[in-house]
Amino acid sequence: MRFCSVFLVFGLAAAMGVSHAADLPPRESYQRPADIPSPPDNPLTIEKAALGKTLFFDPRLSRDGSMSCATCHNPGMRWSDGRILPLRADGVEHARRTPTVLNSAWLTTLMWDGRATSLEDQAILPITTAHEMNFEMPLLLNRLKDVAGYAPLFARAFGDAEITEKRLTQALASFQRTLVSKLAPFDVWVEGDESAMSERAKRGFAVFKGKARCATCHSSWRFTDDSFHDIGLPSLDPGRGARVPPQVTIMQHAFKTPTLRDLPRNGPFMHDGSMHSLDEVIRHYEQGGLQRPSISAEMKRFELTETEREYLIEFIHTLDGGLLDIEPPQLPE
């Protein structure tokens, strides 16, 4: 499905020796794809995405009716929650920050530790986890069946009004696949408009690809390699390491590389929300992180000048396309 059709339906470097665009890295690898991917057993349709949107915003998906998917993945907060750490159902803070769901159609593993391998699989986890939405799936399905307004929505999406776990997760996944970040100044520059990025931002891109080596992990048009790395934060959270044999040292304390799309206004940063500015994040990488056996081989010390740091931050701001024009739906009764 083309980006434009989905959005219509939903309303939806002097300091571095770089001074000309021709000196910058090739742009082709940063071009956005024309289509949103979906699995063969759950092709993306407008009707499924519309149902998924309604479910995403419905707090009745939680046991006590107080929490929807949008509670933590708030469209007004770049599909995160703006908190250092989100609150569990019992009022205790989670150990990990709420990641954005933007551009999740392209993910092959989801959640900070990669425990889910598809959006369909991921959709079940927060609903049924005791300290999140805390609902048993059979009870949830019965609750939805008691809401008369859901039957026609399921019928339009799937051909009949049967409400099942598979259909629930397919609809939620379909809606999330439509959440694609808007065109940012960087994208306009990639397409050839030199005026879309300032000279300072272009120099920052050169720092990003060169001296700072950010692109080693923050690659492709989504600015992530979809892999897991220990970047030397002091947290003792095992991350991906809890899901692989302990002898796989490199995965201990490793977390999924987050996208940099729409990042500047989506802080705080890191999986544990421990950093509050892009300057703080960059300085962490300059210092090389906490040295331990699992630390990524890419975590090598380097030093930027204050000007280079400013250029780099200005470049990262060009990856911000702004808020999606998505209004909460009217919930069925």
Swiss-Prot record:
GO biological process, one term: methylamine metabolic process
Binding site for heme c 1: C69, C72, H73, H271
GO MF terms held by the record: calcium ion binding; cytochrome-c peroxidase activity; electron transfer activity; heme binding
Keywords recorded for this protein, A-Z: Electron transport, Heme, Iron, Metal-binding, Oxidoreductase, Periplasm, Signal, Transport
Compartment(s) where it occurs, according to its Swiss-Prot or TrEMBL record: Periplasm
Binding residues for heme c 2: C214, C217, H218
The record's account of how the chain is modified after translation: Binds 2 heme c groups covalently per subunit.
Free-text function comment from the UniProt entry: Involved in methylamine metabolism. Essential for the maturation of the beta subunit of MADH, presumably via a step in the biosynthesis of tryptophan tryptophylquinone (TTQ), the cofactor of MADH.
Protein name: Methylamine utilization protein MauG
InterPro entries linked to this entry: Cyt_c-like_dom, Cyt_c-like_dom_sf, Cytochrome_c_Peroxidase/MauG, Di-haem_cyt_c_peroxidsae, MauG/Cytc_peroxidase, Methylamine_utilis_MauG
Record pathway: One-carbon metabolism; methylamine degradation
Gene3D superfamilies to which the protein is assigned, alphabetical: Cytochrome c-like domain
Classification lineage: Bacteria, Pseudomonadati, Pseudomonadota, Betaproteobacteria, Nitrosomonadales
Signal peptide: 1-21
Pfam families in UniProt: CCP_MauG (PF03150)
Ranges annotated as spanning the membrane: none
EC number(s) per entry: 1.-.-.-
GO terms under cellular component: periplasmic space
SUPFAM superfamilies membership: Cytochrome c (SSF46626)
